[in-house]
């Protein structure tokens, strides 16, 4: 897969390239989007059981970007559904990582959009706009810093300060 951010490098290969200093997320997310492999520049939002702020962010054009959503690991309400995921896809986002729940998983699973989340819950979240944007969020032993780079695939998530160039093949 290639996009405006260059060639995707599988996370296992990134670990081999980077070595012991790798920033690999320990949290075991479920792949719920139609794209398992996705990557891009990180934008963050911290919100608890409220998705109005993240919806407005995904409504902004961000070709190849990845929104990291820290919902404090709550599975009580869904932060992303098919409408919000479709909004992100339509504005060029590569995908989302949700430290929380989503809903409409069957529809999201058919979208050309990356989505990793802890699980699902059909319950809607509130819509007050509470939350913080572009702050460092931390989970799974990794700090997700706005402007840094995220690679996600079926093996997990790796975060780097900048995109990694694939080594030349022999």
UniProtKB/Swiss-Prot annotation:
Residue sites binding substrate per the record: 81-84, 103
| Entry note: cofactor | Divalent metal cation.
Kindly give the InterPro entries that the UniProt entry links to this protein. Answer: RraA, RraA/RraA-like, RraA/RraA-like_sf
Query: What top-level class of enzyme does the UniProt entry assign?
Result: lyase
A molecular-function term among this protein's GO annotations = 4-hydroxy-4-methyl-2-oxoglutarate aldolase activity
Question: Which Pfam families is this protein grouped with?
Answer: RraA-like (PF03737)
Q: What is its EC number?
A: 4.1.3.17, 4.1.1.112
On the tree of life, the source organism's domain of life is Bacteria
Key word Lyase present in the record?
Answer: yes
Q: Which family does it belong to?
A: Belongs to the class II aldolase/RraA-like family.
Official protein name in the record = Putative 4-hydroxy-4-methyl-2-oxoglutarate aldolase
């Amino acid at each position: 897969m290639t996009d405006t951010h260059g060639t995707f490098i599988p996370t296992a290969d990134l670990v081999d390239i980077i070595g012991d200093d790798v920033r690999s997320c320990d949290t075991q997310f479920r792949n719920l989007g139609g794209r398992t492999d996705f990557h891009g520049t990180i934008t963050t939002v911290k919100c608890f059981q409220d998705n109005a702020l993240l919806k407005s962010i995904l409504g902004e054009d961000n070709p190849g970007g990845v929104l990291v959503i820290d919902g404090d690991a709550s599975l009580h309400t869904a932060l992303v559904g098919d409408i919000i995921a479709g909004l992100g896809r339509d504005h060029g986002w590569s995908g989302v990582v949700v430290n929380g729940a989503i809903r409409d998983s069957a529809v999201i699973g058919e979208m050309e959009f990356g989505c990793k989340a802890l699980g699902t819950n059909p319950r809607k979240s509130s819509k007050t706009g509470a939350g913080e944007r572009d702050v460092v969020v931390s989970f799974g032993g990794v700090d997700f810093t706005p402007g840094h780079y995220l690679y996600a695939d079926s093996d997990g998530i790796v975060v780097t300060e900048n995109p990694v160039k694939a080594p030349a093949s022999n």
